[in-house]
Design a protein with these regions (language model features):
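A conserved amphipathic terminal alpha-helix motif
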Residues: 110-160
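Beta-strand/loop substructures that line and gate deep hydrophobic ligand-binding cavities in soluble
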Residues: 6, 81-125, 141-143
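Hydrophobic pocket/interface hotspot
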Residues: 20, 30, 48, 62, ...
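Short, solvent-exposed secondary-structure boundary/capping segments
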Residues: 69-76
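Conserved catalytic core of Hanks-type protein kinase domains
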Residues: 23-24, 65
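A short, structured loop/turn motif at beta-sheet edges
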Residues: 17-18, 63-69, 94-103
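Hydrophobic/aromatic beta-strand elements that line small-molecule binding cavities or substrate pockets
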Residues: 11, 59-64, 89-96
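Short beta-edge strand/loop motif at the mouth of beta-sheet-based domains
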Residues: 2, 8-9, 15, 19, ...
Length: 160
């Protein structure tokens, strides 16, 4: 299921762009702010897979990897619990110099309307976690499970 919804958010991180870039392409660093574990091949055409919460994996392929500047990758959820199949949406991360370090600008495209809010909430929680771990602080707690179907911001069964 693809759509035309877009999520855009930003976060200032207290480190230079080259340092922040490493937190997107090193599996241990990435897992420290966005999940539990990760396997990454950060090169155009390379794959990634990471477990965000227990048993829920995201995966995709890198489209662009420009050290210290940007990372673009496809995105999706493997289990089907969230109706965004791997490869059906695209995430672009731009790293811009900022007086306080780096402005991380994230744009997630091609989301269906029913999952836009979930992804907006997720990215708006994960980017502050990134800022915290880069600064050497404990990350802000994140839920350990996805919402139950009745709490989820998408229909639990397909509509007519």
């Amino acid at each position: 299921m693809t759509g035309h919804e877009v999520v855009a958010c930003g976060q200032v991180v207290a480190a230079p762009p080259g340092e922040v870039f490493r937190w997107f392409v090193d599996p241990d660093r990435l897992a420290s702010w966005i999940g539990i574990r990760a396997t990454l091949e950060p090169r155009p055409g390379g794959s990634f897979r990471f477990e965000i919460v227990d048993g829920e994996w995201c995966s995709g392929r890198y489209l662009e990897v420009v050290p210290g500047k940007r990372v673009v990758f496809t995105w999706g959820w493997e289990s089907g619990a969230i109706p965004v199949p791997p490869g059906s949406s695209t995430v672009e991360v731009a790293l811009d110099p900022h007086p306080d370090g780096t402005l991380v600008r994230l744009v997630h495209r091609d989301l269906a309307p029913e999952v836009r809010r979930l992804h907006a909430d997720g990215w708006s929680r994960f980017l502050p976690r990134l800022a915290a771990v880069v600064a050497g602080r404990a990350p802000i707690p994140y839920p350990t499970a996805l919402p139950e179907p009745e709490e989820a911001p998408w229909p639990s069964t397909p509509g007519p």
